[in-house]
Every structure is written in C-alpha cells, then in structure tokens.
Amino acid sequence: MRTKTSVSQEDYLKAIWELLEEGQPPISARLAEELEVTPPAVTAALKRMRRDDLVSVARDGHIDLTRKGRAIAERMALRHQLAEMLLTDVIGLPWSKAHDEAERLEHAISPEVESLLLKRFADKKACPHGVPLRGGFAQLRKQGAVLLSDLRANERAEIICVYEKDAKFLEFLDGLHLHPGTQLSIARREYDETLTLRSSNRTMHLGKPATSRIWVHRLSA
C-alpha cells in the first residue's frame, strides 16, 4: 500500500532537491533556514522521512534523496512551475507574487490537472522566472548559463533566469525592465564588482547582491 506524503514532507523534499540542484550541500541548518523552521523540527522531520525511505543522512550530516524521495521532489517542482505559469499567463498575477502563491497551489494539483496543464503550456520551456521545466538549475548549467556577476566589461549577454524566492527582488527587476529574454551589455565593472549595464538605450548600475541572482547566456560580440 502506497503511503501518502504530507504537505510538510513535500516541502522538505522539494527544498532538499532545490539545494542539490543549486549545488549547495543540504544540511539541517540550511533546511531550517530555507523552510523557516527550528532545527529540532528539521531533525524530527528527517527522522520520519528516513523511516519512510524518502531521504538518507550521512554521518557528516549531508542529506540526500532516495529514489522515492527524488521522484516526489521532482514532481512537486514541476507542479510548482505549472502553478506559476497558470497564475501569470492565465490569471495575470504579477511574476513577483507567483512563487509564493504557487508554493500553496502545488500541493493541490492532481495528476489529471498536471497533465492538462502540461498540454496547456506545451510550448513553454521554463517557468516565468526562467527555471527550466524538468531540470532546474542543473539544466541551466548544462545550457552554459553563468551568473551575471561573472561577466566582464564589454561582454554581452541575455538574461535566462532570475532568483524567484524574493518578491522584492523581482519587483526591483521589474522596475528596471530586466526579465528572462532581456539582452544587455556590460559597460563597466567596478572594483567592488558593481556592474554598469546598458539595455534598450537605458543605463543602470547593479551591485553583486543583485547580479549574483541573475543567470545569463553570453552572446557573441
């Protein structure tokens, strides 16, 4: 008999999957920060998920997903992205609000609704924030994506993905008309790593706290 995972377990599994995709070692302290829960709550949740064969925990505290746990996490990640597309493309919700709303909706999407949404958005390759469907940040790396903060003066690039978990950051980018698909050039790179950007006859200055949250593809000069 298949055991149904709880909303809490789905959140934990997706958070672990996202950390792994981003290249960050999943440990209890990082999970507590990511999910805004206490360390004892993480310890108790991991104990239950180990019992249910969803995760494994190494002696050094590194957390990994079992095959069963990864399948659930990837399904939740996909449903999250489908929920974001439904919210932005159909309902018209601003992209800055889509992530938080999708965090709640993803748990209510059934296999039937998932299938219908996949058909509805068959032409889409990524969520509104640019995260590839069925691949996440690992797929971004395979596509040759780099952080905007890595670029040098006189390089050109196209934004392909932005950090989606900070609504204020997304509102900030919106105000600068910086979205996936926007092309820009680096006019200057300062000693403190502030970049002077040019895009559509506009000049703007972005510090590393912003440029380290934007993934781009380099364009030929």
Protein language model regions, located:
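Extreme N-terminal segment that seeds HTH/winged-HTH DNA-binding domains in transcriptional regulators
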Residues: 1-36
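Key DNA-contact positions within bacterial/archaeal DNA-binding proteins
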Residues: 40, 96
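Short, hydrophobic-biased segments on the C-terminal half of alpha helices
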Residues: 46-47
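A short, conserved structural fragment
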Residues: 50-58
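Basic, amphipathic "hinge/linker" alpha-helix immediately C-terminal to the N-terminal HTH DNA-binding motif
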Residues: 61-80
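Mid-protein regulatory/catalytic core that forms ligand/cofactor-binding pockets
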Residues: 106-212
